[in-house]
């Protein structure tokens, strides 16, 4: 309790020193402060190699909503391919390619103890940053940059897009007083009318309005883009898969399809392949995907941009001008 109070004081008094991404963005107010405690994960009698900075397996304990959880992590040994190389250019435009050792990296996958359906994708380079699922709920975790503190912020992924679900009561405040701020550029702030104690009905910009510098189109008050969806599934190191990955959705089998009819997977038409299974990239030139018994899990979200002037509606990539 004292630690939580100190963090609150730091946030109030030293806002520029506590400069985590979520605080800098100002989009997340509803988060929980936790202090992950590392627990040895080495088998009894095992010896950690001295030259190895990042262990092959780690465990962390912390609480989520007052409930103790144990996060099991294993180094993702497939994160880098065997022929991994880095290329950069010198000041005189010479191409320089190196093959740095990548065995001792800091990228992990894992799960929550006693939750068979849980998953986790974590970067442990500087604190714990990434995501984990607990009882079907996706949480993001990242360190709060407070000097000499192990404080981390945990918040639900849904809160990234739903900053303020509980609007302030107007209580007959002066007309024009903001009672519900816009949660994204696709949302509209609501203001007290001066005639009612209730905040007006939540409204948002029209579906199909360009957002995030034309990377997406507004859909029901949000701006769904594939990059954010990959972040939620696989953590901060994920990006959108290459176009060739989405060709798999034309198979119409296993996990690669656009929709199901009577539990039979229906292949995507060539123009709809980016409205089926979502493909992300963690390792260069690889196709990463996820799935579950939930038919919508791991699929491209409705309203997502699937091409210039096109959005995904009912698993079809259609013209945004006629979609809504």
Swiss-Prot record:
Coiled coil: none annotated. Keywords: Calcium, Cell adhesion impairing toxin, Disulfide bond, Glycoprotein, Hemostasis impairing toxin, Metal-binding, Platelet aggregation inhibiting toxin, Secreted, Signal, Toxin. Unfolds at 47 degrees Celsius in pure water, but structurally more stable in various buffers up to 60 degrees Celsius. Pfam families: ADAM_CR, Disintegrin, Pep_M12B_propep. SMART domains: ACR (SM00608), DISIN (SM00050). Disulfide bonds join 179-199, 186-218, 192-199, 211-223, 230-280, 245-287, 258-268, 275-312, 306-317. A motif (D/ECD-tripeptide) lies at residues 185-187. Expressed by the venom gland (at protein level). Expressed by the venom gland. Residues 1-20 form the signal peptide. Potentially useful in the development of antithrombotic drugs, particularly due to the possible control of its activity via the redox potential. Its main location: secreted. GO terms for cellular component: extracellular region; plasma membrane. The keyword Ribonucleoprotein does not apply. PANTHER family: ADAM A DISINTEGRIN AND METALLOPROTEASE DOMAIN, DISINTEGRIN AND METALLOPROTEINASE DOMAIN-CONTAINING PROTEIN 28. Belongs to the venom metalloproteinase (M12B) family. P-III subfamily. P-IIIe sub-subfamily. Arises from a gene lacking the catalytic metalloproteinase (MP) domain and the N-terminal part of the disintegrin-like (D) domain. The latter results in truncated D domain (D'). This is Disintegrin-like/cysteine-rich protein MPIII-3. It comes from Vipera ammodytes ammodytes (Western sand viper). The lineage of its organism: Eukaryota, Metazoa, Chordata, Craniata, Vertebrata.
């Amino acid at each position: 309790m004292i630690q939580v109070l100190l963090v609150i004081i730091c946030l109030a008094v030293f806002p520029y020193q506590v400069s985590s991404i979520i605080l800098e963005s100002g989009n997340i107010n509803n988060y929980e402060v936790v202090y992950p405690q590392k627990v040895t994960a080495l088998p009894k009698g095992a010896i950690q190699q001295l030259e190895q900075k990042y262990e092959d397996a780690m465990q962390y304990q912390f609480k989520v909503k007052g409930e103790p959880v144990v996060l099991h992590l294993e180094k993702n040994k497939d994160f880098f391919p065997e022929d991994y190389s880095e290329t950069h250019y010198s000041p005189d435009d010479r191409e320089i390619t190196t093959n740095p050792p990548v065995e001792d990296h800091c990228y992990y996958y894992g799960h929550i103890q006693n939750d068979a359906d849980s998953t986790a994708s974590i970067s442990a380079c500087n604190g714990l940053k990434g995501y984990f699922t607990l009882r079907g709920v996706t949480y993001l975790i990242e360190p709060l940059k407070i000097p000499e503190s192990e404080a981390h912020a945990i918040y639900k992924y849904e809160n990234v897009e739903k900053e303020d679900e509980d609007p302030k009561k107007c209580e007959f405040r002066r007309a024009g007083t903001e009672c519900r701020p816009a949660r994204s550029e696709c949302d509209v702030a609501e203001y007290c009318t001066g005639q009612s104690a209730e905040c007006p009905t939540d409204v948002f910009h029209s579906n199909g309005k360009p957002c995030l510098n034309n990377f997406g189109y507004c859909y029901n008050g949000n701006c769904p883009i594939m990059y954010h969806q990959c972040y939620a599934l696989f953590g901060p190191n994920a990006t959108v898969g290459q176009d060739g990955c989405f060709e798999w959705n034309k198979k119409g089998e296993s996990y690669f399809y656009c929709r199901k009819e009577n539990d039979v997977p229906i292949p995507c038409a060539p123009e709809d392949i980016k409205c089926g299974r979502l493909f992300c990239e963690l390792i260069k030139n690889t196709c990463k995907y996820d799935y579950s018994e939930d038919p919508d899990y791991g699929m491209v979200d409705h309203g997502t941009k699937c091409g210039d002037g096109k959005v995904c509606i009912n698993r079809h990539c259609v013209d945004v001008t006629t979609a809504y």
